[in-house]
Amino acid sequence: PRFNYDIKFFRSDPMGEINLDFPYLIPFKPGENAKVFDVKTIEGFWGSEEPDSWNATGFQTAPGEPVFASRTGTVVEIVGNTRTGKPENWYHTWTNSVTVLQPDGTLICYRNVIDKNKELEVNEKIFAGEQIGVVPPNTNELILLVFQNSLNSADLRFIIPRFVVNEDKTELLISSKVYSVVHPEKIRGLEMSRREKRRNLK
């Protein structure tokens, strides 16, 4: 007998079990304030097309402001102000971005971040609360997208993360509200091994 089959490649893990209550860190320096805005469009994220349904978190910021990882993961793509390489290898079509594969199989894209000092590398593990870059010149917003490939559809699944707003509380962020940035060690260490905690939590 002959069997027909298709080979599919997924950037994220379509079978990953997502904990919608997982606590994400607000991606700025602890002690600072972060103001949230309503993201109206993700134009340019997926080529000339915009997904029919999507969710994104936007923060007002300023050029040169440090940006920190909201969650532990592995860097899969670092893009400056222009894209190179084969489009079929891209995770999306945004520039000035860092994309990270998270432990639950989802991807997080930090849009409007540059690795000015070239300290990040693809396949490098980064930890929640670790600086990953700065906001580029002439930019006053940072956008976060958490997404996952769908197993039986070309559509992406977008996740609305819950962010840590104080030592013991997480919530969905509200547009136009100002939040104090906190990075509790117990949250930063959630996806670290004991050895990683000793090296990174001081």
Tell what function each PLM region has:
Residues G80, Q131, P136-P137:
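Short, surface-exposed secondary-structure boundary micro-motifs
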Residues P63-P66, V98, K116, V122:
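Short, conserved secondary-structure segments in the cores of folded domains
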